[in-house]
């Protein structure tokens, strides 16, 4: 029949055909169906799908034969089930039986109660079972190598797992500081605008501030002088006001830092020579002696009087710069020295001072609050500098 190409039979009668005359069946050439040397074509019994059109199989009875395929009868042969798998590796394997202890650990069979007690007398082994100083029989001395034995065990097992609670608490502090810093930054950025509003309100007492830069020719709608657009003629004045406000804020911070350093005694300013308006500029100016201990600031200033001898004047441990300014102002303005007794008397009357402060706060408090409210965000920063410096 030829080579089997595994192609479905489109006509449906090979090899179950009965057209014996066509194949000249005789005694020498028997019927093809009975020929033992015929080519077993496994797909010959399968009628090609759509060979004669969609869903049409012509009747082949009589002319093409009487087989089920020739008659147009399609029989479905059930597929043979797959052979049973003998591979047990796909599922969960049963736990194999444990071999005897004498085969897996032959050295364990050599231990007995005497050998165990003898080994237990070793201080390194005993330290693992009994605390230092403890004993089961009372005859064994305390272990001496407890720390080394435990350290050797820790070196094998690794470091302990870090405590997550400590890690969380360590991260919580920086996060809170970051949040507080961001909050203060947003508040500090509002200081220039608030001061600008206060500045412009001085020109419109009792009225609503309106930008004076707009005119009838401009197409700009009415707006506040603190929110001028770039095309407004008052925009340059708004920028100038805010620049001056930034300089004032910077100067205020520097003054506070200077006062703080002076209060801490970190400004070693030499005082004035008694009876003079200036400090000495001679060679003795450089002979300052360091302070006691490890401080980097000098403890005294050497001045050169008229007789040529050096005189050491101690530097105040606190408010050195303030005292220097007061001495300098007292020399320049002699009438300031007359205020010292009055100030000392006024400070000594503590009830009077407190009543005066209360009265001034009650009378000028609301207006002072409106003036000082923009500077409120700076107070936490000043407090932190005062505490940590």
Curated annotation (Swiss-Prot):
One GO BP annotation of this record: virion attachment to host cell
InterPro entries: HBV_HBSAG (IPR000349)
Post-translational modification remark: Isoform M is N-terminally acetylated by host at a ratio of 90%, and N-glycosylated by host at the pre-S2 region. Myristoylated; this modification is essential for its interaction with the host protein SLC10A1/NTCP.
Use in biotech settings: Systematic vaccination of individuals at risk of exposure to the virus has been the main method of controlling the morbidity and mortality associated with hepatitis B. The first hepatitis B vaccine was manufactured by the purification and inactivation of HBsAg obtained from the plasma of chronic hepatitis B virus carriers. The vaccine is now produced by recombinant DNA techniques and expression of the S isoform in yeast cells. The pre-S region do not seem to induce strong enough antigenic response.
Region annotation (Disordered) ranges: 73-107
Gene Ontology CC terms: membrane; viral envelope; virion membrane
Intravirion side: 2-242, 192-242, 359-364
Residue numbers on the Virion surface membrane side: 2-170, 264-337, 388-389
Top-level division of the source organism's lineage: Viruses
Lipid-substituted positions (N-myristoyl glycine): 2
Residues bearing attached sugar chains per UniProt: 309
TM spans (from-to): 171-191, 243-263, 338-358, 365-387
Pfam families cross-referenced by the UniProt entry: vMSA
Subcellular locations according to the entry: Virion membrane
Alphabetical UniProt keywords: Acetylation, Caveolin-mediated endocytosis of virus by host, Fusion of virus membrane with host endosomal membrane, Fusion of virus membrane with host membrane, Glycoprotein, Host-virus interaction, Lipoprotein, Membrane, Myristate, Transmembrane, Transmembrane helix, Viral attachment to host cell, Viral envelope protein, Viral penetration into host cytoplasm, Virion, Virus endocytosis by host, Virus entry into host cell
Major subcellular location class: virion
Regions of compositional bias (Polar residues) in chain numbering: 85-95
Annotated stretches, region: Pre-S1: 2-108
Residue segments, region Pre-S2: 109-163
Disulfide-bonded cysteines: none
Subunit structure and binding partners: Interacts (via its myristoylated pre-S1 region) with the host SLC10A1/NTCP; this interaction is essential for viral entry.
Family affiliation: Belongs to the orthohepadnavirus major surface antigen family.
Function per UniProt: The large envelope protein exists in two topological conformations, one which is termed 'external' or Le-HBsAg and the other 'internal' or Li-HBsAg. In its external conformation the protein attaches the virus to cell receptors and thereby initiating infection. This interaction determines the species specificity and liver tropism. This attachment induces virion internalization predominantly through caveolin-mediated endocytosis. The large envelope protein also assures fusion between virion membrane and endosomal membrane.
Domain notes: The large envelope protein is synthesized with the pre-S region at the cytosolic side of the endoplasmic reticulum and, hence will be within the virion after budding. Therefore the pre-S region is not N-glycosylated. Later a post-translational translocation of N-terminal pre-S and TM1 domains occur in about 50% of proteins at the virion surface. These molecules change their topology by an unknown mechanism, resulting in exposure of pre-S region at virion surface.
Name of protein: Large envelope protein
């Amino acid at each position: 029949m030829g080579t089997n190409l595994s192609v479905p039979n489109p006509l449906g009668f090979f090899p179950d055909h009965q057209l014996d005359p066509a194949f000249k069946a005789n005694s020498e050439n028997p019927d093809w169906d009975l020929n033992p040397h015929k080519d077993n074509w496994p797909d010959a019994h399968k009628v090609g799908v759509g060979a004669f059109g969609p869903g049409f199989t012509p009747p082949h009875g009589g002319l093409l034969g009487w087989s089920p395929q020739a008659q147009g009868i399609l029989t479905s042969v059930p597929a043979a089930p797959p052979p049973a798998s003998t591979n047990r590796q796909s599922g969960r394997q049963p736990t194999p039986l444990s071999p005897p202890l004498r085969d897996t650990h032959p050295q364990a069979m050599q231990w007995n109660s005497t050998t165990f007690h003898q080994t237990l007398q070793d201080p390194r082994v005993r330290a693992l079972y009994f605390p230092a100083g403890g004993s089961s029989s009372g005859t064994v001395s305390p272990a001496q190598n407890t720390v080394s034995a435990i350290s050797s065990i820790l070196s094998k097992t690794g470091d302990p797992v870090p405590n997550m609670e400590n890690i969380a608490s360590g991260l919580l502090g920086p996060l809170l500081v970051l949040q507080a810093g961001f909050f203060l930054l947003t508040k500090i950025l509002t200081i220039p605008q608030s001061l600008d509003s206060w500045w412009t309100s001085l020109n419109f007492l009792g009225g609503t501030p309106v930008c004076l830069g707009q005119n009838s020719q401009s197409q700009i709608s009415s707006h506040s002088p603190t929110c001028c657009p770039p095309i407004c003629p008052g925009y340059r004045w708004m920028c100038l006001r805010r620049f001056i406000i930034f300089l004032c804020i910077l100067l205020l911070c520097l003054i506070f830092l200077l006062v703080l350093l002076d209060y801490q005694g970190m400004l070693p300013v030499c005082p004035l020579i008694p009876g003079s308006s200036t400090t000495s500029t001679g060679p003795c100016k450089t002979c300052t002696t360091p302070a006691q201990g490890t401080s980097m600031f000098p403890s005294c200033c050497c001045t050169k009087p008229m007789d040529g001898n050096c005189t050491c004047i101690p530097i105040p441990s606190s408010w050195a710069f303030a005292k220097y300014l007061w001495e300098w102002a007292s020399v320049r303005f002699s009438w300031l020295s007359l205020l010292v007794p009055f100030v000392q008397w006024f400070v000594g009357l503590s009830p009077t001072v407190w009543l005066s402060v209360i009265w001034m706060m009650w009378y000028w408090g609301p207006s002072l609050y409106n003036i000082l409210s923009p500077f409120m965000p700076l107070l936490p920063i000043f407090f932190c500098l005062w505490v940590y410096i």
